[in-house]
Structure formats: structure tokens, C-alpha cells
Amino acid sequence: MNAEIVWRPQPRQAEFMRRPEPEALYGGAAGGGKSDALVIEALRQVHIPHYRGLILRKTYPQLSDLVDKSMAYYKRAFPTAQYNATSHVWVFPSGAKIYFGSMQYTKDRTNYQGKAFDFIGFDELTHFEWEEYSYMMSRNRPTGPGTRVYLRATTNPGGVGHGWVKARFITPAPPGTPIVEQFPVRMPDGTEKVLERARVFIPSSVFDNPALLENDPDYLASLASLPEAEKQALLYGSWDSFSGQVFTEWRNDPGHYQDQRWTHVIAPFAIPRHWKIYRGYDFGFSKPFSVGWYAADEEGRLYRIKELYGCTGRPNEGLRIDPVEQARRIREAEQNDPMLKGRTILGVADPAIFDESRGESIAAMMERGPHFLHWVPGDHTRLAGKMQFHYRLAFDGEGRPMFQVFSTCRHFIRTLPNLVYDESNVADIDTRQEDHIYDECRYVLMENPISPPRQTVQPPVGDDPLELHRRARFYRV
């Protein structure tokens, strides 16, 4: 008697499922069979009695599709397996268990405190924040001898976690190439040992799922008919253009760094001594603090010429240094930079640093000697500030915007394009993101407001570094 084949992976699904790295992300575009691969992958060790697996979605209602898939596959593969709809857990003949869970709010991660899972799968990883993902890494540990411990995730571009997911899995290496990170650990005997942990991104698209295209020939046309940004993300898997992106007008074209046309990122140049200089500041302790220096030319165009970003290198994690030390670093940066040394600089900061309700304000601490760093409170009006970004990012007939960024300001270039809208307040950005540079810059823009441009011009199709107006190129693995 021939055994029934419950599920057969497509080639790209098989590539994802055979990867040895402790972390792997699968997806990019829609229709690649991401959720099916995740649900099946969780079954790999159900022959081990003490095995525990966990599949997560951001909210409980979003779990229903995954549970439905498990109903279709698990019962056929293991007829005596039982699903408990109250506790959302499958119990297999060996005693192994696969749980389905959610984490709507970051505080919900404590629901998993003290628990261990050999396998953890995240469906739609960009819906999660870094703090949630990193906490669950600590829950990913063996429940007993003989189990493999690893994390798997699937996602499309976009969502509140787009920035950190892109920085962790997409930017560091080409698809299919292991990203190896080293961690020094001090051992009990005082020696230092360097440990390594690898992760990888496996791209997929609807073209990797011929079974779907055969069953639903119109699905490809449905993706192709989406608005441009959404089509680039869901059809072609673009991480530079996606649904929910706030600043879709942002352009970073190295081919125009020198002539400064049709790009917001430009090559650094010497700042004339008569231009005004501004310094923006957003305080942070456990989250990053951000300082940006800006020059204003005779036409009112602003240039971000330098930045100081207080982060550890991990997503949205601050250096935890006090205001006085931050002031010292800011003053040191100005004294060591020929563009800034000896110049009059107007500092504009988050109004919250002037709060004296709990004692001496942050602004007062920074203004004391020996650093004497003076600030004026910035305009914190959020929607008006966001519109100043749109007004200044617009291109005129000659391809010049009213705001440009030196190519050395890598954290600005990294974070601004990743900002997404708040689903609860669709006119504003989602503040759960790494938005500290955006806030700091907003105070400077509001100090120098401009009127809406009378006419804006779209970049020529030939000047298209993100390939938003042509078929996207596919990564080869």
C-alpha cells in the first residue's frame, strides 16, 4: 500500500526547509507558499515525545488561516493527532506538541516567560518589533535531548518591523548567503570565547509557486494590477518600495550624487561660511538619541551634513548614556569637524527635554559647563512636521528638492525610507519604529517651514535606481 503524499514542497520551499542556519527568513513577494512551508516545517520533529513547537502571528484573529492549514495537513499526516481549540495546541501520537500563539503588544511577550520551544516560527515577521523577536530567541532552547533548536520566519515587505527585518536579513548579504555574526563571551575561568550564529534570507515569489498559478491563473494579474509600490513589494519582492511606506518620493541615486539632481542623497561638499547651521536633537537613553547638523543655503534649501546617532548597532537600541555625556559627545563632534568648528549653531530639540516636573531638565543639564550646549524647544506639531518633509522632498522642474542629505549620514539614509504609517492614525507615522532621526529632523524643518510647492515633477523613467517603473530584477540564489 502506497503512503499518501500529504504535501510536496516547491523547489524554493525545499531550499528554505533544508537550510542549516539557526535563523532563516523566507519570502519577500506574495504567493510563494510561505505559510504552507512554515506550518509543515513545524512537523519536522513531532516523532520526539518532548518536542515543542510554536507558530506565531501578531494578533490572534490572524492565526485562523494558519490553524486552517494545520487542520488540512496535520490530521491527514497523523490521523490520531488532536487539536485543542481552547489552548490552540496540537498533540501528536508521540506526545509532541505544536502551539499556535500571538503577541499583539510587546508586553505580551511575557506570556512566554519561562517556556522553551525547540522550534519557533514567525508568520509575517515584519508585523513584529525587534524586541518581540529578540525576546523569543531566548525562548528558543531545547526541551530535552536530541532536538534541533532553530527559528524560521516568513514575511512580505512592509509593516512596523520592515526596517529591522531588512537590516537583519536583507541588507548584509545577497539572498542565500549565510550572514555570520560573532559574539565574544567571557567564560567562568576568565578566558574569552568567540561564538558564531548564522542566519539567511531565501527569497520567493509567485513565480516560485507554479501550483498556485495553475490553480488560480488570475492571481498574477491581480498582483500586477496593484498600486505601484504595493506591486513592487508583493509581485517582485522589493524591499525599497512597499505598501504603507510614508515617504514614497525618497530617492537615493548614486549616479546623481555629484550633479545633485533627482536624488535626495548627495556627495558631501564644503559648506560656505555664511550659510546658517542648525543642530537637531532627539533625546534617547534606552532608545537611540539622534543629533543632526543642517546647513541652509541662500534659497532656503536644507542639507543634512553630519549626524551623531547613539545606538548600539542592534535595532532601535540606545547606548544608555546620560544627558551630560551626550552633550560632551555633541560638543566634541563640533570641535573636531572643520565644517562646524567656530560657527554659530542654533540647536533645536524635542520640547520634552525642557520638562522640570521631575527635577532638573535635560536641557538644563546639557547647558551647564563645561559643554554649554544650548537648545530652543522645537515645534512638536506632528502632522505639520510630516508635511514639511513632503514639501521639501518634492522635485522641481530641474530635479532639485529643497532637502538633501550627505551620503555620509548613513543612519538617516537607512531609517527614513523604512517608515510606515500608523494603522490607528493613518495620517501619521507609526511611532513604534526607529523614528528618532525623523523626529530630530522634523524639529529643524519646522524651524524653517516652507510653503507647498506650486508644481512638482516626477523623476524621468530613465532615472530610476529603485526600478519602480520597470520590471524588477530577481535575485539568483
Regions found by a protein language model. Give the residues of each.
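Pre-P-loop entry segment of helicase/translocase ATPase cores
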Residues: M1-P22
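Inter-Walker segment of RecA-like/P-loop motor cores
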Residues: P61-D118
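Walker A/P-loop NTP-binding motif
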Residues: S35-P49
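ASCE P-loop NTPase helicase motor core
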Residues: H127-N209
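Conserved RecA-like ASCE P-loop NTPase motor core of nucleic-acid helicases/translocases
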Residues: Y51-L63
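Mg2+-dependent endonuclease catalytic cores in nucleic-acid-processing enzymes, primarily RNase H-like
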Residues: G292, G300-Q433, P449-T456, P460-V461, ...
